[in-house]
């Protein structure tokens, strides 16, 4: 995991006694691979204001204009990516993405106090199919309102209704 925060752009709004900060963080993430296995990962940037303030605003998101990796699928449901790792492929163990951070608040110290992280979640193929089906329901990509409904993926064959399992880690930025 390597991240490179670029120099933040700061705009001052003296009439409101506020600043607006925009910063790009370039991330190269090496994903674990297993032989003869199809692994899926959810990648979700998160940000947390350490001191809740009604007049402050902070957001972090994947920059969709950045070069898209064909293994990554945008999931607006989680404001992140679903990545399908290709087992046994040379040179495809890592993924590069660009995060865009925006902050509106009183001062630069407030921006620097933000807790930014990248949540990486390893999920089963069944759970990946579930997320994709939910994304298709939420964003039907041009389906007519009166077309056949899309069903959410389910795994009821075992009788337990378990979609899949996951493990996650939060990587601080």
Predicted segments, located by residue:
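A sequence/structural signal for flexible, mid-protein segments enriched
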Residues: 1-173
């Amino acid at each position: 995991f390597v991240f490179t925060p670029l120099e933040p752009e700061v705009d001052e709004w003296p009439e409101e006694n506020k600043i607006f900060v925009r910063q790009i963080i370039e991330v190269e993430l090496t994903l674990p691979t297993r032989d003869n296995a199809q692994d899926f990962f959810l990648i979700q940037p998160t940000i947390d204001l350490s001191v809740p303030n009604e007049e402050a605003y902070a957001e972090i998101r994947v920059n969709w204009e950045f070069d898209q990796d064909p293994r990554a699928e945008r999931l607006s449901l989680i404001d992140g990516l679903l990545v399908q790792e290709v087992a046994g492929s040379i040179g495809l163990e890592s993924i590069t993405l660009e995060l865009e951070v925006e902050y509106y608040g009183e001062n630069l110290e407030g921006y620097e106090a933000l807790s930014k992280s990248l949540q990486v979640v390893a999920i089963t193929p069944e759970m990946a199919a579930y997320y994709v089906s939910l994304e298709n329901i939420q964003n039907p990509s041009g389906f007519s309102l009166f077309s056949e409904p899309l069903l959410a993926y389910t795994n009821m064959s075992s009788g337990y209704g378990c979609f899949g399992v996951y493990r996650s880690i939060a990587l601080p930025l």
